[in-house]
UniProtKB/Swiss-Prot annotation:
Protein location: Cytoplasm
Source organism per UniProt: Anaeromyxobacter dehalogenans (strain 2CP-1 / ATCC BAA-258)
Superkingdom, natural source: Bacteria
Taxonomic classification: Bacteria, Pseudomonadati, Myxococcota, Myxococcia, Myxococcales
GO annotation, cellular component aspect: cytosol
InterPro entries per UniProt: DALR_anticod-bd, Gly-tRNA-synth_bsu, Gly-tRNA-synth_heterodimer
Broad class of enzyme this protein falls into: ligase
E.C. number(s) listed in UniProt: 6.1.1.14
Keyword field contains Heme: no
Entries under NCBIfam families matching the protein: glyS (TIGR00211)
Catalysed reactions, as listed in the record: tRNA(Gly) + glycine + ATP = glycyl-tRNA(Gly) + AMP + diphosphate
Family: Belongs to the class-II aminoacyl-tRNA synthetase family.
Protein name: Glycine--tRNA ligase beta subunit
A Pfam cross-reference name: tRNA_synt_2f
Keywords: Aminoacyl-tRNA synthetase, ATP-binding, Cytoplasm, Ligase, Nucleotide-binding, Protein biosynthesis
């Protein structure tokens, strides 16, 4: 057994590319070794901006032999009456590269056939691995890649060296102009000389560590966090928690060194979000806060190179930030010379989307949709504030501050609203209507912000789809998936029992002046189908797919209600008796489907002949009222528990009663009984879509 070590050295790879490339290297090498029939131990990848490396411990010295069996024509066709091979047999043998005498007879599900067994002898690992590693590096995918001027090989950035060692012995691997060797390189400035490697992961990590490179992201993260903690104390505070920035800086440096800097206290008069945004988004600096979480006029920058005189580095960092904050202060002071209401008309000169008009049109439609949603929820008292918040929601797009810091849209509008003395609820709504930004981001704080947020996303979703634009598997330039997910998250989190179909219709009303690419009904169905697709995708990440399909088939117009039904059904499925219940109700639903909804009659007790059907009616009458009450309260766990008490009676009914009797009156009466049973659960879930079996003892019984 020997360790395989493979490293790709390159010019600085963008930080966002590195984690995905490391995951791909690890996954692809594991799969490639398995496909190559090379046994191995741990596979792990490590990397920095200048190198991507992966190793496999304890690689077998040789492939295992591959045994394959190919089946040919039936024996009756392969040999004639005298037992001599026919052209069919000789042709099959020739296609397999063997003599006809090597054919054997084998029993298959399709009868006795001729077959040939071939054994491919395993090759030595050093013969197999070079080509395998060349495919590995060539298969790495990046959002953007560069091509050498001398060949067609591509990579995130120009490849400068490669290392490929098996048990310390070099393998010849080529990518473009670069051929692998057995030396790597340390820190670009602190240890640029070649470093000979023994080929083991431990040797690799240790030698690079001495050369000022922490190749292992786990070790580098710990060092980075320690440096940030040290610098925070030096700055008489602590570094503001920012996991996303930590992750980014982690792949910007090979050896982190924190430097504490300072900026003018007067800049603390700016909104904290402005200062933080400038530091983190533009300079990759960490903000420093005091014990109460208030921003201090200090920052921490992380250098990739430890310098002899930190004061020189500090001065450089401070100089860059000082200029940026001066610009921010200028924009802030200029913006405040005009009130938000004075900027509303400016939105008419800003295009939202060519076919949907201006940002002013958009704001007016958002207000109309938000008001309609509020009335549908019985929140009429919010309408006046909703119209005001909608008018002002996009106004800050025309401010100098948002022009310079686009990520602060909404945030700056809220700050300006508070400074002007507008209602705090309206200021919060201006900020919150952009939330959630991502799948795990925080949600709007109030109904006001939530309804403007939903209306904004509905307008985008219905409007963009309405004018003929679509999200494809490869691209979503208008953020339609993000809009749909945002709608669903807000509606579910706030428990809004909204009709999605009605909400789409209300949005189409607001878009009445827009020329649609298809008929109104077609657009509405396209939007609802898109929303259902997002619901399905989101819920199947947590719940069994069959349960999701069952619930959606029973209705998803009210997603809050559908989610409650799904959670109740998932809890019920975890119980040991669920299989019998699901099978019984599936039979009920199947009979209803076969009957096509016709032929059923109101149940006449006088026509009940068998004890099993009489017992079922009695059991039904005991639970129907309770189910109606529980369902009205949306207490779906209780509904399912109550309905489950019918399972024994339903099972006995199917065992002893012929539903589709020849007598039309009996058949109609029994179908009516099935219809009443189905009515108890048909609007909860379509049990026909649930994958479940009755317990073995129940089937045997």
């Amino acid at each position: 057994m020997a360790d395989l070590l493979f490293e790709i050295g390159a010019e600085e790879i963008p930080a966002g590319f590195v984690p995905g490339a490391l995951r791909q290297l690890e996954d692809d090498l594991s799969k490639a070794l398995a496909d190559a029939r090379l046994a191995h131990g741990e596979v792990r990848s490590v990397g920095t901006p200048r190198r991507l490396a992966v190793w496999a411990r304890d690689v077998a010295p040789k492939q295992t032999d591959a045994r394959t069996e190919a089946f040919g024509p039936p024996v009756a066709q392969a040999y004639d009456a005298e037992g001599k091979p026919t052209p069919a047999a000789t042709g099959f043998a020739r296609s397999q590269g063997v003599e006809v005498s090597a054919l054997v007879r084998a029993q298959t599900p399709k009868g006795e056939r001729v077959a040939v067994t071939k054994v491919e002898k395993g090759r030595r690992a050093e013969q197999v691995l070079p080509a395998l590693l060349e495919r590995l590096v060539g298969g790495l995918r990046f959002r953007k890649a560069m091509r050498s001027r001398f060949d067609e090989a591509t990579f995130a950035r120009p490849v400068r060296w490669m290392v490929a060692l098996l048990g310390g012995r070099p393998l010849k691997v080529r990518h473009g102009e670069v051929t692998s060797g057995k030396v790597t390189y340390g820190h670009r400035f602190l240890a640029p000389k070649a470093i000979a490697l023994k080929g083991t992961p431990d040797d690799y990590l240790a030698k690079l560590r001495r050369a000022h490179v922490l190749a292992d992201p786990v070790e580098r993260r710990a060092a980075l966090l320690a440096e940030l903690a040290r610098a925070g104390k030096e700055a008489a505070g602590k570094v503001r928690d920012d996991p996303a920035l930590v992750e980014q800086v982690l792949y910007l440096v090979e050896e982190p060194t924190a430097v504490v800097g300072e900026f003018e206290k007067s800049n603390l008069e700016l909104p904290p979000e402005v200062v933080i945004s400038e530091m983190r988004n533009h300079q990759r600096y960490f903000a420093v806060v005091d014990g109460k979480g208030r921003l201090k006029n200090r920052f921490v920058a992380v250098s990739a190179t430890r310098v002899k005189d930190p004061a020189v580095a500090r001065h450089g960092y401070e100089r860059v930030l000082r200029a940026r904050l001066a610009d921010a202060r200028f924009f802030f002071e200029e913006d405040r010379k005009r009130r938000l209401h004075e900027r509303i008309e400016d939105l008419g000169r800003r295009t939202f989307q060519a076919k949907l008009g201006s940002e002013l049109d958009r704001a007016q439609r958002i207000g109309a949709v938000a008001s309609a949603l509020a009335r549908a929820l019985g929140k009429d008292a919010l309408v006046a504030d909703l119209l005001e918040a909608s008018r002002l929601a996009k106004v800050d797009l025309n401010t100098g501050m948002v022009g310079e810091f686009p990520e602060l849209q909404g945030t700056m509008g809220a700050h300006y609203a508070r400074l002007e003395g507008l209602k705090p609820e309206i200021a919060d709504a201006i900020e919150d209507h952009y939330k959630p930004i991502g799948a795990a981001e925080e949600l709007p704080r109030s109904d006001l912000g939530a309804l403007v947020a939903v209306a904004d996303r509905l307008h985008s979703l219905v409007g963009i789809i309405g004018v003929g634009e679509k999200a494809t598997g490869a691209a979503d330039p208008f953020g339609l998936r993000r809009s749909a997910i945002g709608i669903l998250r807000i509606v579910i989190a706030r428990g809004y029992h909204l009709s999605l179909a009605a909400a789409v219709e209300q949005t189409l009303d607001a878009l009445s002046g827009v020329k649609l690419a298809a008929g109104r009904a077609v657009v509405a169905e396209q939007v609802l189908d898109f929303l259902r697709g997002r619901v399905r995708a989101a819920w199947t990440e947590r719940f069994d797919a069959d349960l999701v399909e069952a619930v959606l088939a029973a209705g998803s117009d009210d997603v809050v209600d559908a989610r409650r039904r799904l959670e109740a059904l998932a809890d019920a499925k975890a119980r040991p008796d669920f299989g019998s219940l699901a099978v019984a109700f599936k039979r009920v639903a199947n009979i209803q489907e076969k009957a096509g909804g016709s032929g059923a009659a109101a149940v006449d007790p006088a026509l009940l002949r068998d004890a099993a059907e009489k017992d079922l009616l009695a059991a039904l009458e005991k639970v129907e009222q309770e189910v109606v009450a529980r369902r009205a309260a949306r207490d779906y766990p209780a509904v399912l528990r109550t309905v489950a008490t019918l399972e024994p009676a339903v099972a006995r009914f199917f065992d002893g009663v012929l539903v589709m009797a020849e007598d039309p009156a009996l058949r109609a009466n029994r179908l009516g009984l099935m219809r009443r049973v189905a009515a108890l659960f048909s609007d909860l879930a379509d049990f026909r879509k649930i994958q479940a079996e009755a317990p073995a003892q129940a089937r045997a019984g």
